[in-house]
Curated annotation (Swiss-Prot):
Reactions catalysed: D-arabinose 5-phosphate = D-ribulose 5-phosphate
EC number: 5.3.1.13
SIS domain residues: 34-177
Protein name in UniProt: Arabinose 5-phosphate isomerase GutQ
Protein species of origin: Shigella flexneri
Keyword line: ATP-binding, CBS domain, Isomerase, Lipopolysaccharide biosynthesis, Metal-binding, Nucleotide-binding, Repeat, Zinc
Tagged with keyword Isomerase: yes
Gene behind the chain: gutQ
Site (Catalytically relevant): K52, E104, E145, H186
Positions of Zn(2+) binding: H75
Keyword Metal-binding: yes
Length: 321
């Protein structure tokens, strides 16, 4: 029994791979035409399909939308009962139907023509009514389905998904869509956290900023270290310009060397030190800390004025790893 299950599973995968391997050679003028129509679309790409084609169509619409092409899915039956009103003349419709003869098309195609809406077809029958009505046809035909009964859409749905990915990626690259663009449409994801967050989004503010004046003593700085627990204190002049930092390490070295706690902190601090810009990308700031092997740093504004503080734990808590 187990061997039979494995054999069927492997055979299914082999058949799907075999059919999918024929797709690249089919890409030609129609693929380029479809991509250009989408690229020059001033509205949205409306993806539609019935049954398994509809399920794949939802994924294709989602992929387009997340890679720079506004898109949504509409079910053909819903389209014929009011949702055609969602589609405007500046939109493009991508209709998926393996047979290319879905009965809904008899009613949808004339309405698209009335509105001068460009129709793209993804079908296994390029000479079907759908294929003949479309401005570009993407051929997803298969010699056989992977289903042992040759009935359930299997190889054909894989081909549909792959053709949709190929189209979306070609359009994405042509748009110059980059990582930051992707992050803007995925703000809650790990990539969004890495690329969209700025230092000022994560930094500690107000009373949570460890700081003392240049005139403060080592004792004052030690108490501030203890209060904030950040591992450093920013030492600032009267204009809030950071002149140096006093760290846990500086304190240990000062005490081991016999330094007095009443000494001005500017004699014990690390002059200058690393500061981070509030408007910098958080991922870049984290890399600065990692490269310099420090765990925290003061944050300054464009004028060099102290405005916050941040440590590595703040990055990790924001999902920037």
């Amino acid at each position: 029994m187990s061997e039979a299950l494995l054999n069927t599973g492997r055979q299914t995968l082999m058949l799907e791979l075999q059919e999918a391997s024929r797709l690249p050679e089919r890409l030609g003028d129609d693929f380029v035409r479809a991509a250009n129509i989408i690229l020059h679309c001033e509205g949205k790409v409306v993806v539609s399909g019935i049954g398994k084609s509809g399920h794949i169509g939802k994924k294709i619409a989602a992929t387009l939308a997340s890679t720079g092409t506004p898109a949504f899915f509409v079910h053909p039956a819903e389209a014929l009962h009011g949702d055609l009103g969602m589609i405007e003349s500046r939109d493009v419709m991508l209709f998926i139907s393996y047979s290319g003869g879905a009965k809904e098309l008899d009613l949808i195609i004339p309405r698209l023509e009335d509105k001068s809406i460009a129709l793209l077809a993804m079908t296994g029958k390029p000479t079907s009514p759908l294929g003949l009505a479309a401005k570009a046809v993407l051929d997803i035909s298969v010699e056989r389905e992977a289903c042992p009964m040759h009935l359930a859409p299997t190889s054909s749905t894989v081909n549909t998904l792959m053709m949709g990915d190929a189209l979306a990626m070609a359009v994405m690259q042509a748009r110059g869509f980059n990582e930051e663009d992707f992050a803007r449409s995925h703000p809650a994801g790990a990539l969004g956290a890495r690329l969209l967050n700025k230092v000022h989004h994560l930094m500690r503010r107000d009373d949570a900023i460890p700081q003392v004046a240049l005139t403060a003593s080592v004792m004052d700085a030690m108490l501030e270290l203890s209060r904030t627990g950040l591992g450093l204190v920013a030492v600032c002049d009267a204009q809030q310009q950071v002149q140096g930092v006093f760290t846990d390490g500086d304190l240990r070295r000062w005490l081991v060397g016999g330094g007095a706690l009443t000494t001005p902190v500017n004699e014990a601090m690390t002059t200058g030190g690393t500061t981070l810009q509030a408007q910098s990308r958080a991922i870049d700031a984290k890399e600065v800390l990692m490269k310099r092997k420090i765990t925290a740093a003061p944050v300054v504004d464009e004028n060099g004025k102290l405005t916050g503080a941040i440590n590595l734990q703040d990055f990790y808590q924001a999902g920037i790893i």
